[in-house]
Amino acid sequence: MTFRTLDVDSITEPVLTEQDIFPIRNETAEQVQAAVSQLIPQARSAIQTGNALQGLKTLLSYVPYGNDVQEVRTQYLNAFVDVLSNIRAADIPAFVKECSTEEIDNIVNFIYRGLANPQAYNSSVLLNWHEKVVEISGIGCIVRVLNSRPDL
């Protein structure tokens, strides 16, 4: 006796493509590399002049995504964590209050990427940022990042 009224084997399996996972980007990998190559020195010079918050704003103005730019994303993450490390804990709440929802989501996304590799990045800095961001913006940023596509 069978309880199936539908022949499951006759249905073809859905195929998940890279376009389903990553949103379509209007730029080539070389253009992404060029854009990030311009942003990173600007952010590092902002750190050297004592304005790390401006360096973070600079980095948040352009976020690389896509599977074909992994090396660029790693360079970006290194610069991002360097900037976060140079911002005083007392300045974090005021900065987060000025950020848009998208910028906060990007910050949390990169915090999680940094926490995924504790050998390379200072977890205490990242956890401090995570605490302050969630305290101010709520748990919605966590939910949005965990439910988003893995595009960063």
Curated annotation (Swiss-Prot):
| InterPro entries recorded | ARPC5, ARPC5_sf
* Keywords, sorted A to Z: Actin-binding, Cytoplasm, Cytoskeleton
GO MF, one term, reads: actin filament binding
GO aspect biological process, one term = regulation of actin filament polymerization
Where it sits in the cell: the answer is: Cytoplasm, Cytoskeleton, Actin patch
Pfam families listed in its UniProt record: P16-Arc (PF04699)
* An example Gene Ontology CC term for this record: nucleus
Q: What is its main location?
A: cytoplasm
Gene3D superfamilies attached to this UniProt entry:
Actin-related protein 2/3 complex subunit 5
Give the function comment from the record: Functions as a component of the Arp2/3 complex which is involved in regulation of actin polymerization and together with an activating nucleation-promoting factor (NPF) mediates the formation of branched actin networks.
Subunit organization = Component of the Arp2/3 complex composed of arp2, act2, arc1/p41-ARC, arc2/p34-ARC, arc3/p21-ARC, arc4/p20-ARC and arc5/p16-ARC.
| Family the UniProt entry places it in | Belongs to the ARPC5 family.
Q: What is this protein called?
A: Actin-related protein 2/3 complex subunit 5
Species for this entry: Schizosaccharomyces pombe (strain 972 / ATCC 24843) (Fission yeast)
What high-level taxonomic lineage is stated for the organism? Eukaryota, Fungi, Dikarya, Ascomycota, Taphrinomycotina
Q: Which gene encodes it?
A: arc5
